[in-house]
């Protein structure tokens, strides 16, 4: 007999919210049928309108809060409910940190099937000030009714929600956006129409080096000719402190990829300089660099602590990117081998090592699951392996190769608790056990959490 679904689309229901979903949405039940309600807080009774019904769950839109949680707070941003950038501004920051810790723990239990009774689970490392933390912002520029618009995409759409002030990006980026809006209005600059492929300005990228204060502005254009660019350069260079370079990136392809291949430096330098800890990095428009440098330093310090290096160890750094973790590890390691599939990232890693005077690192282009077994075949035995994979997690074959190499310590840095938990479940079957788990809030006001895990070989 087919299960009767107790809710109907477009009807309103009173729902008690007894849990949080993956990105912080409220979860309640009607006759044991699950309903997700965005912006509802655990412990609240709400009225929600059902906007979507599936076989096993429904999605409701928050209409009214009948019983309010003491964990609720007023969002600071006027476009919070329209813009897709933040998910948790309505939740007190202490509760955001608790939510993120619980999210990690639930994944470890449910997906990893791990016994956590002897595992140390630390509180989420948060920020003293959880606003204005992003050192990079990318804003689409579109056109509506003949007028250019700058903002963020509405969640799950390409509709641009105009923004004057974003509370999670560095405040100097907000100042630059207002100047660009002034320039667009004054000189009637065309925004890009993604349907017709016409228009001048496609995207604005702003990068700021927090330690040095240097700022880079990138104008992504559909055409090589940018009318009145001299006026914009004058406005930016006279009104923005710390501006180091203004770059034009030309992208005339019909694509969702933001940056094109060709760049022209319109004013100043093509890179900015920043530090993580003691290490200096040159950052171009295309460089990968963690967007929250304050929390990155805490994350990498935890990785170094978990690695427990004494100066005698060989370390493998899988998915090493531009070598930022490798550099941190090199301080206390005998040798660090970094592997990364993106050739440009490896070139950056080599430059970063050279300019910091580091000689005990070696960087290899290739898939970690292919290159690390080759290193092991050459007789290079790691005492410590660090993995920092993309959201999809580690390849199963890589985990098996690591286990066969039998390092005493594995340090796993993850941006997705679900794939982390899956991989930890595999490692637990290969002779390893989880010792300690440290969630880090890299992205306050959002549902995302970074996690670093200390894993030890079980010596029988």
UniProtKB/Swiss-Prot annotation:
EC number: 2.1.1.-
Domain TRAM residues, every copy: 6-64
Annotated residues for binding of S-adenosyl-L-methionine: 290, 319, 340, 388
GO biological process, one term: rRNA base methylation
Chain segments annotated as coiled-coil in the UniProt record: none
Residues that hold [4Fe-4S] cluster according to the record: 77, 83, 86, 166
InterPro entries (UniProt xref): MeTrfase_TrmA_AS, MeTrfase_TrmA_CS, NA-bd_OB-fold, SAM-dependent_MTases_sf, TRAM_dom, U5_MeTrfase_fam
Example GO molecular function: rRNA (uridine-C5-)-methyltransferase activity
Family the entry assigns: Belongs to the class I-like SAM-binding methyltransferase superfamily. RNA M5U methyltransferase family.
NCBIfam families in the cross-refs: rumA
Stated name of the protein: Uncharacterized RNA methyltransferase CA_C0523
Organism: Clostridium acetobutylicum (strain ATCC 824 / DSM 792 / JCM 1419 / IAM 19013 / LMG 5710 / NBRC 13948 / NRRL B-527 / VKM B-1787 / 2291 / W)
